[in-house]
């Protein structure tokens, strides 16, 4: 059976990534890589959060992490930041990391298997129910104007 268009799209996105197993992702954070949790609040509340992870919901990711964006977070200092994206199962994070790479953030990658694999591997995880607010930056007049043409 031929792979679906979605399977092909995901495979193409992943072909640019050096994806990390949970233990390797955790070790990378201990060396200075930044773990970015893109899961929506209901998933973070239901399953817990990784201590120290930066919370940036998927719909704001590019604007918060790109160093040229007026809406960037303070950690978005340049193209060489090592961003490790985490979602629930490792699908959305692969697509998100590939987009970050396409925008010039060449060290962006994701966690194989997402939070489910992170938990199964025994990596640090806070209790369900407690959630941190997403990381925000001062809102510019137009997010789109900070990286090219207006949205």
Language model: regions and residue ranges:
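Rhodanese-like catalytic fold shared by cysteine-dependent sulfurtransferases
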Residues: 1-34, 41-83, 89-151
């Amino acid at each position: 059976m031929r792979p679906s268009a979605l399977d092909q799209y995901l495979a193409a996105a992943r072909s640019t990534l050096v994806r990390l197993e949970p233990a390797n992702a955790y070790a990378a954070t201990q060396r200075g890589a930044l773990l970015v949790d893109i899961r929506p609040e209901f998933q973070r509340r239901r399953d817990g959060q990784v201590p120290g992870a930066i919370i940036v919901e998927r719909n704001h990711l590019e604007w918060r992490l790109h160093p040229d964006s007026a809406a960037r977070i303070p950690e978005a200092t340049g193209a060489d930041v090592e961003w490790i994206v985490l979602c629930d199962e490792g699908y959305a994070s692969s697509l998100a990391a590939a987009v970050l790479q396409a925008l010039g953030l060449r060290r962006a990658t994701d966690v194989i298997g997402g939070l489910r694999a992170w938990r199964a591997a025994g990596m640090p995880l806070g209790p369900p129910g407690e959630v941190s607010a997403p990381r925000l930056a001062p809102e510019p007049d137009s997010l789109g104007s900070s990286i090219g043409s207006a949205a």
